[in-house]
């Protein structure tokens, strides 16, 4: 039977094959006519790439069917250059951890009563456990930015 192979240039070549011929045999016949090595050939029929070990009848290729020939591309994408930074990276801030830091906020009297040294923020958005920073002339909440300023008595 006769089949057609459309090449990359748009030229159509005719091949005399049998339905029991393998795709390898067809590629060999294309090499004899066009000089393209079989390892670079990719044959496509009905949107599917034809595998080498299969026969023409496996893909239901009948007389006067047209196969499309495309070249196989090897390799992947272009290698990218690694970015070189001119300035060194900024060192991330490490928080200092102090053991038993809560002891700074409370004082125990001689009779066993606990006295709070720092004021807790009264704002509802902060919640319990948020203390205000004690400055010389003010108290400041770092979370909600509530500030109490003390007036100096003269």
UniProtKB/Swiss-Prot annotation:
- Whose protein is this, by species? Neurospora crassa (strain ATCC 24698 / 74-OR23-1A / CBS 708.71 / DSM 1257 / FGSC 987)
Which lineage ranks, top first, belong to the organism behind this chain? Eukaryota, Fungi, Dikarya, Ascomycota, Pezizomycotina
The zinc fingers classed as C4-type run over: 121-144
What residue ranges carry the coiled-coil annotation?
none
User: Example GO biological process term?
Assistant: modification-dependent protein catabolic process
Protein family: In the N-terminal section; belongs to the ubiquitin family.
Q: Which protein, by its recorded name, is this?
A: Ubiquitin-ribosomal protein eS31 fusion protein
Domain Ubiquitin-like, first and last residues per copy: 1-76
Also noted in the record is: Ubiquitin is encoded by 3 different genes. Crp-79 is synthesized as a polyprotein with one copy of ubiquitin fused to ribosomal protein eL40. Crp-6/ubi-3 is a polyprotein with one copy of ubiquitin fused to ribosomal protein eS31. Ubi is a polyprotein containing 4 exact head to tail repeats of ubiquitin.
In the UniProt record, which is one GO cellular component term?
nucleus
Q: Where is this cross-link: Glycyl lysine isopeptide (Gly-Lys) (interchain with K-? in acceptor proteins)?
A: 76
Q: Which SUPFAM superfamilies match?
A: Ubiquitin-like, Zn-binding ribosomal proteins
**Where is the cross-link described as Glycyl lysine isopeptide (Lys-Gly) (interchain with G-Cter in ubiquitin)?**
6, 11, 27, 29, 33, 48, 63
Q: Which domain of life is it from?
A: Eukaryota
Q: Which GO terms describe its molecular function?
A: protein tag activity; structural constituent of ribosome; ubiquitin protein ligase binding; zinc ion binding
UniProt keywords, alphabetically? Cytoplasm, Isopeptide bond, Metal-binding, Nucleus, Ribonucleoprotein, Ribosomal protein, Ubl conjugation, Zinc, Zinc-finger
